[in-house]
From Swiss-Prot:
Gene name of this polypeptide: rpl16
Single GO MF annotation: rRNA binding
Alphabetical list of NCBIfam families matching this protein: rplP_bact
SUPFAM superfamilies assigned to the protein according to its UniProt record, in alphabetical order: Ribosomal protein L16p/L10e (SSF54686)
Top-rank lineage group of the source organism: Eukaryota
Pfam families reported in the protein's UniProt record: Ribosomal_L16
Organism expressing this protein natively: Pleurastrum terricola (Filamentous green alga)
Keyword entries, A-Z: Chloroplast, Plastid, Ribonucleoprotein, Ribosomal protein
Protein name: Large ribosomal subunit protein uL16c
Length: 139
């Protein structure tokens, strides 16, 4: 699973997901991409599940880039604990994804294989996604 090696602070504010992605919304590395259409927190487990599904379907063909990284810690309190006594301990890591953000990119495979692989990966995501081809994506 992906997680930062070290961070400046152990715990983060939850924050808000306003607006659309202004960065990471264009295809840079590959020829095909999976783009988010909704705002969400995507956990490191979900990112890894999508990656595994795509690499298994492509059978070591082509190259895959993961364009998101889970750098936000999500804290949780123990079950049935009373209010107060501070914030819970970090349990897992999430990537904050806004609409328009590219999640994965692929290269070196046919469009049919890339489309099918990304459809399988999209089922692992908690959001609606869109398949993009480099030639048709807006600059």
């Amino acid at each position: 699973m992906l997680s930062p090696k070290r961070t400046k602070y152990r715990k983060h504010h939850r924050g808000r997901m306003k607006g659309k992605a202004t960065r990471g919304n264009k295809i840079v590395f590959g020829d095909f991409a999976l783009q988010a259409l909704e705002p969400a927190w995507i956990t490191s487990r979900q990112i890894e599940a999508g990656r595994r599904a795509m690499t298994r379907y492509a059978r070591r063909g082509g190259k895959l880039w993961i364009r998101i990284f889970p750098d936000k810690p999500v804290t949780m309190r123990p079950a049935e604990s009373r209010m107060g006594s501070g914030k819970g301990s970090p349990e897992y890591w999430v990537a904050v994804v806004k609409p328009g953000k590219i999640l994965y990119e692929m290269k070196g495979v046919s469009e049919i294989i890339a489309r099918a692989a990304m459809r399988i990966a999209s089922y692992k995501m908690p959001i609606k996604t869109n398949f993009l081809v480099k030639s048709t994506s807006p600059n």
